[in-house]
Amino acid sequence: MSTGFFGDTAKIKYEGPESTNPLAFRHYNPDDVVLGKRMEDHLRFAVAYWHSFVWPGGDPFGGQTFERPWFKDSMEAAKLKADVAFEFFQLLGAPFYCFHDADVRPEGRNFAENTRNLNDIVDYFAKKQDESGVKLLWGTANLFSNRRFMAGAATNPDPDVFAFAAATVKTCIDATQRLGGENYVLWGGREGYETLLNTDLKRELDQLGRFLNLVVEYKHKIGFKGTILIEPKPQEPTKHQYDYDVATVYGFLKKYGLENEVKLNIEQGHAILAGHSFEHELALANALGVFGSIDMNRNDYQSGWDTDQFPNNVPEMALAYYHVLAGGGFKTGGTNFDAKLRRQSIDPEDLLIGHIGGMDCCARGLKAAAKMIEDKALSAPLEERYAGWNELEAQKMLQGGFSLEEIEARVLKADVNPQPKSGRQELLENVVNRYV
C-alpha cells in the first residue's frame, strides 16, 4: 500500500538510452546479461537508510531543510519511515538496503531500551522484507553520533564505553542475522584521535584489536554466515582515524590475526580523502585478498571533506568495476549508495532521481568494464609487460632459488644490461576512453 510520500509515481522501468524521462532508467536493465550474469546480480544495488531517510539536509552553517513526516523520535515515526523506505526500495527496484541501528529505532534512555526498540523495529522489518522481497545487504551499529562516543567506542579511555559499544554491536549482529543480512560492517568514525597529547596509541590499537576479535568470535559462536567488513576512512569526524585506508587496515588485521576473518567495504569518497583513487583501493584490496563490498558515491574534488554525492563519472565507474570483475565480482558484498541529496533537493522525487542517475552510471561503468575484460584490452598489455617473469630463471629468482650472491654472479657472467621499455600509459588511457 502506498504511503503517498512519492505521490502517484510508478515503479521505475528501463526505457533505453534515448529516453528523456527523468524517472526511468536509460542504462540499467536488471535483466541484461553481462559476462554470463544478470546485471542486477553483478551490481547488487543497495540503498543506504541513513542518507536517504535520516539525514535532515543540514550543514555546519544551517539546519534542517528536508521536511519528512517521520522526523520524530518515536516508534510510530520509525515505522512510518520504514513504510516509506520499503516503498522506495520497491519503486526503485533495489534488491538490498543497509542500516545503522540508530537509523531505524528511536533512541532509548539506556542500553536495554535501545535493544527493545531495535528488536521491535526488526520485527517490523522482517514483515516488510517478506512482503517486498527486498533483502538486507548489511547492518551496522552507530558508534559515533551519541556524545558517549565522543572519545571513541572501542578505543575510548573509559572501559564502560567499550562495554556499551560491544554490547550494542552484539545486538546489531543479532538483528543483522535475524534479517538475513549478508554482511556486518564496522566503521570507526571516532576510532582515532584529535591530538596525540591525550592519546595512548598502542593502548587504543590493542583495544580496537580486542574489540574486533570479540566480533569475530561472536560471529562464529552464533553461526552467522555473513562477512565481517571494515570500512576505511582517513579522517572526519576524527582528525586521524585508525582505519585510514586499505593498506593501513590490512596491516592492522595482520597484527591482530584477523586477515583471514575480515574483509573491506571500500568507499569512493573515503579513497579520495586518503589521497588515493577509488580503483587504487579496490585493486589493492584484491591484491591483498580482502575485498568485500563497496560504498558508492563521489566527492567534490574541490572540497576537503566527504560530500557523499551520487556517482556521475562513467570512466571512474568503469575502472572501479573493472577491478571488481577482475577480482571475481561480489561474493556477499554489493554496491551500496552511500550518497545523499544536496540540501536544496527537497522534493521526494529528487531521492528517486539521484538513485536512478547513480544506478545508470554504475550500469554504464559495468558494461564498459565487462567489454574491456572480454577484449583483454588491459589484461593483454599487462601480461606482455610482465612476460619476462614467466621465464624459468626469473621464476627461480622470485621463488627463492637464487641467493643475492648468485644473482650478482649471473649479472656479471651474462653482462646483464637491461634497457627500459615504454610503459605506454597514454595508449592505455586512450584504450579506456574508447570503451566509455
From Swiss-Prot:
One of its GO terms (biological process) is D-xylose metabolic process. Transmembrane segments: none annotated. Mg(2+) 1 binds at E231, E267, D295, D338. One of its GO terms (molecular function) is xylose isomerase activity. The active site is at H100, D103. InterPro entries: Xyl_isomerase-like_sf, Xyl_isomerase-like_TIM-brl, Xylose_isom_bac, Xylose_isomerase. Binds 2 magnesium ions per subunit. It holds the Pfam family AP_endonuc_2. It is found in: Cytoplasm. The keyword Isomerase applies. Its EC number is 5.3.1.5. PROSITE patterns: XYLOSE_ISOMERASE. GO terms for cellular component: cytoplasm. Keywords: Carbohydrate metabolism, Cytoplasm, Isomerase, Magnesium, Metal-binding, Xylose metabolism. Mg(2+) 2 binds at E267, H270, D306, D308. Belongs to the xylose isomerase family. NCBIfam families: PRK05474.1, xylose_isom_A. Homotetramer. This is Xylose isomerase. It comes from Sinorhizobium medicae (strain WSM419). The gene is xylA.
